[in-house]
Structure formats: structure tokens, C-alpha cells
């Protein structure tokens, strides 16, 4: 089937769904048709814009062939033809992007987990910097940032930290942040002024609802214990800390941030559900597209994706060869959009090349 035939088929389907919805159908049939109709709205709008430009180009070319046109009119028509010819490839690309298979998780909120990697205390300090950077970014985007757990070192660093970020299409924007982030800077404790390299790992998971992942009580092992502070001392006289293990997958989440065992359990279940959902997504993605494993967005957490070089004031994303010399704006102010948009565009381009 040609590209044009495929577009015509989509327009026919959209029109038929509209007629069906107007015919008075009810119940599950109405719900199903409404969902399909809504899912097609965006691509149909882009198809109509593309078809309109094609039609206008054809009309302009035909008009240009008419006898007796003065020079001013001919120049005006040629300008219009030039504009339309330039716009058509962009409109066609927009249609193709709209036709790409959607990741069901893209529209979801996200859970972000940051863990200190190699580099000791400096790595923990960098993990805290990254976590705060994502909090600033969430604020800029108008998303709700809820801290789930922080395991601190007592001097400003984070061994690990997690948060729930709620908003529209959060996961689609943040999913490319998963991986190893490397920092190069002179630690405050370094008397010789030598640059140290350390790293932190970021994992971004789509926040799963109960409808996405059903967790049976029989599949959970829940252990409670007393919360401990940064030095290992017990900071609570009750067993408020919770460790939940999902027996079928072996995935474990431990939480002790809240004084209430009930609150710790609720937060731990939220993280557990997200991890199980992400594991299932990974398996399906691997089965569906093994050939795309090496692409941006493969989510390989062992992959070094970005370097933050403070002496040079630069942030470099190694997947797309993009370097920005504004480290303070990125790290302190959370201005990540240039990286986010470039990564999304790169991912779309690679997917389009497979069509």
C-alpha cells in the first residue's frame, strides 16, 4: 500500500467512526469508538494539513501554465510554489511521526531514581546535584515533584534518592535520562585542585497504576524493621521501615523515610509497581524490536550517556554529540529542554528510518 493510500484509509476510518458515534451507539461500543476516534484526531489533522498543501501546490502549478499572466502575477505564483515545496517535506515528516507506534507509557507520570556510583563521597554529592536538577526541571514544566525516599550521607550527598513526578507526558520527556551520568570537577575537599571523575546512575520508570499492574498479596513478602540514620544508629523506636519483595520477580524495595509504617509501605508499593511495570515493558520491547537495542532510549543503565564538566562549564550528551556550554543553567536551574527535545527528535528520526 502506498503512502497516499494509507493516508486515505486513515481518513476513511476517521470519517466512519464519526458517523458511528453520531448514530446513537451506547455502552462499550461507544467507549471503544470514542477512544479510537480521539486517538486518530492528531494524525488526521496533520494528514489534512499535508493534503491541503499538496492540493494548493497542484493548483499553483496549473495556474502558472495559464496563458497571458503578467510578470507580477507569475512572480507571486512562483513564490507560493517555492513556499509550498519547502513546507511539504516537513508536513510529510510530521504525518509519519504521528503514524509511528506509540509507547503506551509516554503519557504517564514517572518515578525517577538517582544512585551514587563510582567516586565515593563526591559521587554522592553529584547524585544530590542531579536529583535537585530534576526537581528544578519539574518545577519549570509545571509538574508535581514528590520526594519518595532519600538516603543521605550526612554531609549533603545522596547514596540514593527517588521521587514521583506527576504531569502530562512526563515519561516521554524524561525516559532518555536513564543511564550513567558522569561528573568531572574539583571536589571541595581536594587541596591540590585536581579534577576528579565520578558518576551517578539515573533510572526513569513510568508510574504504573493498579490497572497497569495487578499485584497479588500472596506474591509479596513484607518485612518491617527499625529505621536507621546516616551513621547506622537507630532513629526510631518502632518498626516503621518497610522492605517489600515481589516473590515472582525478586524485585525488592526498602523504605524508611516516613515515621509511619503505613506511609512507607504505600510509597514502597508505588515504586515496586513502577519497577515491575518497567520490567514488563522492557521484555516486550526486547521481543518486539531486538534490532533497536543500541538506539537512544534503549534505557541501558550501564551506558554512559552524559558528562558534566565543571572546569570547562560544559554538558555533553554522548548519544547525540550535543554539547552545551552553560552548565549552571542546566544543573542549577534545571534547563534541560535543549537536551530533551534533541533526544526526542533523534529517536523519532531513527524510528522513521526503519519505516
Swiss-Prot record:
Family (UniProt): Belongs to the prokaryotic/mitochondrial release factor family.
NCBIfam families listed in its UniProt record: prfA, PRK00591.1
Modified residues (N5-methylglutamine): 233
Function statement: Peptide chain release factor 1 directs the termination of translation in response to the peptide chain termination codons UAG and UAA.
One GO cellular component, as annotated: cytoplasm
Gene3D superfamilies named in the record: 3.30.160.20, 3.30.70.1660, 6.10.140.1950
Chief site of localization: cytoplasm
Biased composition (Basic and acidic residues): 280-293
GO molecular function, one term: translation release factor activity, codon specific
Protein's gene: prfA
Region (Disordered): 280-308
Organism: Rickettsia felis (strain ATCC VR-1525 / URRWXCal2) (Rickettsia azadi)
SUPFAM superfamilies for the chain: Release factor (SSF75620)
Subcellular location: Cytoplasm
Protein name (record): Peptide chain release factor 1
Keyword line: Cytoplasm, Methylation, Protein biosynthesis
InterPro entries: PCRF, Pep_chain_release_fac_I, Pep_chain_release_fac_I_sf, Prokaryotic/Mito_RF, RF-1
Post-translational modification: Methylated by PrmC. Methylation increases the termination efficiency of RF1.
Keyword rRNA processing: no
Keyword match Cytoplasm: yes
